[in-house]
Amino acid sequence: SGDIKAILERNGSERTRLIDILWDVQHLYGHIPDEVL
């Protein structure tokens, strides 16, 4: 989805940003959907 791409672009592709990416996804959807994992 475009929202996920925007989150990834904003956080970059560094593995150290994984928690920040997951927090953004959870904030967007209210949970972390299986298809995102």
Curated annotation (Swiss-Prot):
Listed EC numbers: 1.12.1.2
Keywords carried by this UniProt record: 4Fe-4S, Cytoplasm, Flavoprotein, FMN, Iron, Iron-sulfur, Metal-binding, NAD, Oxidoreductase, Plasmid
Subcellular localization: Cytoplasm
Cofactor note: Binds 1 FMN. Binds 1 [4Fe-4S] cluster.
Catalytic activity line of the entry: H2 + NAD(+) = NADH + H(+)
Recorded GO MF terms: 4 iron, 4 sulfur cluster binding; hydrogen dehydrogenase activity; metal ion binding
Requisite cofactors: FMN; [4Fe-4S] cluster
Major localization listed first in the record, in broad terms: cytoplasm
Keyword Transcription tagged: no
Top-level lineage group: Bacteria
Keyword Iron-sulfur among UniProt keywords: yes
InterPro entries attached to this UniProt entry: NuoE_N
CC per GO annotation: cytoplasm
Role played: Subunits alpha and gamma of HoxS constitute an NADH--oxidoreductase.
Complexes and interactors: Tetramer of an alpha and a gamma subunits (flavin-containing dimer), and a delta and a nickel-containing beta subunits (hydrogenase dimer).
Family stated for the protein in its record: Belongs to the complex I 51 kDa subunit family.
Name assigned to this protein: NAD-reducing hydrogenase HoxS subunit alpha
Organism: Rhodococcus opacus
Taxonomic classification: Bacteria, Bacillati, Actinomycetota, Actinomycetes, Mycobacteriales
